[in-house]
Amino acid sequence: MSLGVLAAAIAVGLGALGAGIANGLIVSRTIEGIARQPELRPVLQTTMFIGVALVEALPIIGVVFSFIYLGR
């Protein structure tokens, strides 16, 4: 096993860990906001879904870059 494979695995793993933590924080804050102001639920949910989509894009990009790096 080369160091490149190990580096790719660490990059993908840390990207997934960071995304998991960020998604938890995003959803937690959204629930707090909805509990405080229920009338803003549609706006908060839309913002939450956009935020979660952006956060989830980063680990996917990390996996793609890892495959590109390993393919060389």
Curated annotation (Swiss-Prot):
| Recorded superkingdom | Bacteria
Record bears the keyword Membrane: yes
Keywords from UniProt, A to Z, are: ATP synthesis, Cell membrane, CF(0), Hydrogen ion transport, Ion transport, Lipid-binding, Membrane, Transmembrane, Transmembrane helix, Transport
Question: By its UniProt entry, which InterPro entries does this protein fall under?
Answer: ATP_synth_csu_bac/chlpt, ATP_synth_F0_csu, ATP_synth_F0_csu_DDCD_BS, ATP_synth_F0_csu_sf, ATPase_proteolipid_c-like_dom, F/V-ATP_Csub_sf
Among SUPFAM superfamilies, the record links this protein to: F1F0 ATP synthase subunit C
Gene Ontology molecular functions: lipid binding; proton-transporting ATP synthase activity, rotational mechanism
Location within or outside the cell: Cell membrane
Which NCBIfam families would you find in this protein's record? ATP_synt_c, PRK06876.1
User: What does the annotation say about its assembly with partners?
Assistant: F-type ATPases have 2 components, F(1) - the catalytic core - and F(0) - the membrane proton channel. F(1) has five subunits: alpha(3), beta(3), gamma(1), delta(1), epsilon(1). F(0) has three main subunits: a(1), b(2) and c(10-14). The alpha and beta chains form an alternating ring which encloses part of the gamma chain. F(1) is attached to F(0) by a central stalk formed by the gamma and epsilon chains, while a peripheral stalk is formed by the delta and b chains.
State its role: F(1)F(0) ATP synthase produces ATP from ADP in the presence of a proton or sodium gradient. F-type ATPases consist of two structural domains, F(1) containing the extramembraneous catalytic core and F(0) containing the membrane proton channel, linked together by a central stalk and a peripheral stalk. During catalysis, ATP synthesis in the catalytic domain of F(1) is coupled via a rotary mechanism of the central stalk subunits to proton translocation. Key component of the F(0) channel; it plays a direct role in translocation across the membrane. A homomeric c-ring of between 10-14 subunits forms the central stalk rotor element with the F(1) delta and epsilon subunits.
Q: What is this protein called?
A: ATP synthase subunit c
Question: Which organism does this sequence originate in?
Answer: Geobacillus stearothermophilus (Bacillus stearothermophilus)
